[in-house]
Amino acid sequence: MKGRYGLELYYHKKRVIVFWVIASLSGLIAISILSFFLVKVFRDKVLNLDSVSSLYKNWDLHTAEGYSSVYETSLQILENKPYHNTALAFHGYSSFMLAESETDNMKSQQLLDEAIFSLRTAKRNCREDVLPQINYMLGRAYFYKGKLSNYHYYSDLVVKYLNLAVDAGYVSDDIPLLLGLSYASLGDTDNSIAAFTEALLVRESDTLLFNIAKQYCNNEQHSVAKQYLVRVFETSENEDLLNKSHILLGQIYINEKNYDDAEAEYNYILQKDENSADAHYGLGLVHELRGDNIKARAEWRKCLKIQFNHPGALKKMA
């Protein structure tokens, strides 16, 4: 009996020891798991807050270095959290700013694509108070993308997003000018004139005056167009813009059937630059309207010799 009792006691103690060993190991495992999650929470919350804070801080520097820092930091956040809204917005902002200053056209296009993708993704779940600025930056990005590509494929998107920003109360000095140029490329003359006129109240420039004159010419309001061209002649020192203004004035005179003054404008340009394709083309139009097709075609041949793909001359010589 004593032997059996002693054996049972031995096994009982052994089971108790095994129990406590297992319990201790389970406790250690539980503590390790808890520690892991606590560290992860700390890293995700505290360190992520530091990263987001640095986005605002570096963006407010308004420098190339600041934009580069925002770009890299937002990229790091998005690697772990692809739909982090603040990171998406700032990645879009910084990509655009870097694209604007990039001298390599291909790199600039890649950055613009990043900007547009990030901003469009950010729009899906952003705060209502942030949405107007995202729309504004999207409008700017599409405008610059169209400018780089030398086409107007994106003008409708520029108008769409900038108007969304304006309708929500967003204000920026460059919006009227961007809208004016985009409406012009879409052939919406009335809205272009309205936007350019608003831009003129913000800051007058010779280029803006020329663009307004061009739109009034397209709208067949020639007397108003000439008034703006006079202001260009009075204020501009940009030789290229002045030549474009004389070309436009020559076109206005042709529309008014004032062929002598139109000829004078084109000859004025050719006295300074005999290789002006547009001036030779304009002279050809004057000769054609006077009934002298031989002289007209001679001028258009000169035009094509200078600029082989001049659309107007190609059409006339076809």
Residue spans of the language-model regions?
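N-terminal leader/linker segments that initiate helical-solenoid repeat arrays
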Residues: 2-124, 128-129, 133
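Helix-start (N-cap) detector for alpha-helical repeat units in TPR-like alpha-solenoids
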Residues: 51, 85-86, 129-132, 173-174, ...
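Residue-level recognition of tetratricopeptide repeat
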Residues: 59, 93, 97-100, 140, ...
